[in-house]
Amino acid sequence: MELRQLVKEVPYLMETRGNMSVEIAALCSNSREKTENGIFFCFAGAHFDAHQYAPQAVQNGCVALVVERFLDDVNVPQVLVSNGRAAMARICEAFFDHPERKMRFVGITGTKGKTTTSYMVKSICEQAGFKCGLVGTTGNMIGEKHIPSSKTTPDPIDLMRDLNEMVQAGVQVVAMEVSAHALDMHRLDGMTFECGCYTNLSQDHLDYFGTMENYFQCKKAFFTSGMAKNAAINADDERAAELLRDVTIPHMTYGIAAEADLFARDIEITENGVSFELRLRNAEYIQINLRMTGMFNVYNALSAAACALILGVSPENVRAGLESIRSVPGRIEMLPTNTPYRVILDYAHAPDALSNILRTCRTFTKKRLIALFGCGGDRDKGKRPIMGRIGGELADLCILTSDNPRTEDPMEILREIEEGIKETTGEYVVIENRRDAIRHALEIGREGDIIVLCGKGHETYQETMGVKRPFDEKVVVQELLTELRGE
């Protein structure tokens, strides 16, 4: 595709230099990659400025640049834009012939519940006869085909490449997790969502957004900027009233405590699942028997149901889709251990999520509730003592250990968590090495105990000092049990 054709729809275009007829055959955001006839995107980030790597990108095959300032030391065509990230999204869409215009999109945003809700939306829409795709934290899916991804919402190059593959595979509906980072970084600029879903807002990502207000405003923009055509909104969330006041698009509310268009009644929670009546304001209702437990999964089911109903899916297909889903990777996932105690894997890595999983497990714990968790490095430090306090209040024993320390000192992170747990009477131990911590949990587990491994969930790595090393807790648990049994 000619460069001029590629950039003609970019609203951020200011000026061009050089031969705009040059053919572009690839997209590049990593100057170290060999990219023949590629276009390299330059913009200033939080930690580096890609403009300084433009010569390396050209040396590796790029024949054009998108820049936020002209570079005099690089002799290739340059496209000057006012916002490099936003321009990147639009150019990626054009390069792949606009896959975002060829499918229906459901975007789920919120601090918690995005992954499970997206899986539920996919399941419901498949029951309705649609071929579905999924984009999210656990990776992307085309039907049952899994495509690994390192971000909740991928960068535009990867996102549009995967969406184009979905189009080629005949996908009709895509359930997508929409992170606040993706919104703020313009990764989704140019996309339109038939339905946007707001799940909730609680403390997370303050290392990036600074304040909860900034975090909320970023989420709200998804519903007020024209990106979403319809909205499904959790009426029970404390920021719902403010969101509803400013949202002008058609919307459906859902909830349990608050008055809502879609709500759950007669909720019964067991260790094996949840049953409830899903009711509409017109008095129509359907009985739902989820095979996933926890009150938070009632909310996830409500959010998915609201999205599906907005898409025009029948209540019966909503029921069938919700009841057919057994589990979501790393979300209150019961591991097969063949032990007198149970081991549960969960992605909980923020205060509310930790509270939810521990409260849920407490309802069906016969003996002790043992919580193993840490906090990620280079992320919101304010939540560390809060999570320590939550663990100390809700678990019988906390095992504090490393999550993904990244570039921070693991013991310093643990000391900050410890500050919170010391405010409680909860029993705890500190074992920095996560594998050793899991071994300790398995060694002390007794009949009737529940051990909850929090924080990693579906992840198959641990990041320490900037290096990601293989660490799949499902595998680690099985390896340790084999060792402990002397097999």
Regions found by a protein language model. Give the residues of each.
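A short acidic, helix-capping loop that chelates divalent metal ions and anchors anionic groups
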Residues: V74, M141-H146, Q203-F209, R379, ...
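Short internal beta-strands
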Residues: Q59, V63-R69, A231-A235, L372-F373, ...
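Phosphate-binding loop of NTP-binding sites
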Residues: M88-A235, R239-V247, L302, L311, ...
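Short, well-ordered alpha-helix to beta-strand connector turns
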Residues: I24, E36-N37, C62, N75-V76, ...
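Short secondary-structure boundary segments
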Residues: V67-F70, V178, N200, A235, ...
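Acidic, Mg2+-coordinating active-site environments of NTP-dependent enzymes
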Residues: E9, E68-N75, A169, D184, ...
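ATP-dependent carboxylate-amine ligase
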Residues: M1-L13, E36-I39, A283, A306-E316, ...
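N-terminal leader/targeting and accessory segments in enzymes
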Residues: M1-R90, A94, E238, A260-E268, ...
